[in-house]
Every structure is written in C-alpha cells, then in structure tokens.
Curated annotation (Swiss-Prot):
Gene Ontology CC entries for this record: catalytic step 2 spliceosome; commitment complex; cytosol; nucleus; pICln-Sm protein complex; post-mRNA release spliceosomal complex; precatalytic spliceosome; SMN-Sm protein complex
Gene of this entry: smd1
Record GO biological process: mRNA 5'-splice site recognition; mRNA cis splicing, via spliceosome; spliceosomal snRNP assembly
Organism: Schizosaccharomyces pombe (strain 972 / ATCC 24843) (Fission yeast)
Family classification: Belongs to the snRNP core protein family.
Gene Ontology MF terms in the entry: mRNA binding; RNA binding
Name of this chain's protein: Small nuclear ribonucleoprotein Sm D1
Residues of the Sm domain: 2-74
Ranges where the record places region Disordered: 81-117
Pfam families: LSM
Function: Plays a role in pre-mRNA splicing as a core component of the spliceosomal U1, U2, U4 and U5 small nuclear ribonucleoproteins (snRNPs), the building blocks of the spliceosome.
Positions with biased composition (Basic residues): 87-117
SUPFAM superfamilies: Sm-like ribonucleoproteins
Keyword field: Cytoplasm, mRNA processing, mRNA splicing, Nucleus, Ribonucleoprotein, Spliceosome
C-alpha cells in the first residue's frame, strides 16, 4: 500500500505533523490528497522557538511535511490492510508496421538515397 493511501484513511484522526522548517502542527485531519497535501481543523501551530498559535483550519502542502506523529491508540494493523481492488491488466495486442515513423518520403534513409526534392 502506498503511504498516501494510508494517510488518506486518517480522516478525523488527531495527529501532529512536523514540517521541514521545524514548525509543529497539531490538529485533526479533514482530508489528505494524492500529493500528500493535508487539510486540518482545530489546529495548534507551534513555529520553532515561538508560542503556539491556535488556528481554525490549515492546509499544508505535501512536500513541506517532514513526518507525521500518529497517536498510539491508532489501530495500524486494520488501517494497513489494502482494501482496494487492483484492475486486471489487458493484454497488449501486437501492432505491426508502425516502427519507422512518419517522415517525408525517403529523406534520412541512409547513404546513396535520393535527396527527395
């Protein structure tokens, strides 16, 4: 299972997130998208070396997240079960006669070929 798919299951869980700049964000996850952008509510944001600031809602861009700190009470064994069904791959048909490109006549066909004009 991809990490992002696991994080998408954490809706309504209260977590702490440490950002790459050292800021720690503590709040309840409302959603996580495929780019790991995380949306939180009831947030307490502690910028490195400052007092905590309460924020109603906050969105964090995924590439700014260093790591998630999950609560100990989280049932990881049930969340890590991959419940998505994998689509069956179709067999590719062999297509012939498309390998030489779609150029202009005999141009670029090697030595001794006519010039094409």
């Amino acid at each position: 299972m991809k990490l992002v798919r696991f994080l998408m299951k954490l809706t309504n869980e209260t977590v702490s997130i440490e950002l790459k700049n050292g800021t720690i964000v503590h709040g309840t996850i409302t959603s996580v998208d495929m780019q790991m952008n995380t949306h939180l509510k009831a947030v307490k944001m502690t910028v490195k070396g400052r007092e905590p600031v309460p924020v109603e809602t906050l969105s964090i861009r995924g590439n700014n997240i260093r790591y998630y700190i999950l609560p100990d009470s989280l049932p990881l064994d049930t969340l890590l079960i991959d419940d998505s069904t994998k689509p069956k791959q179709k067999k590719k048909e062999v297509v012939r006669g498309r390998g030489r490109g779609r150029g202009r006549g005999t141009r670029g066909r090697g030595r001794g070929a006519s010039r094409g004009f």
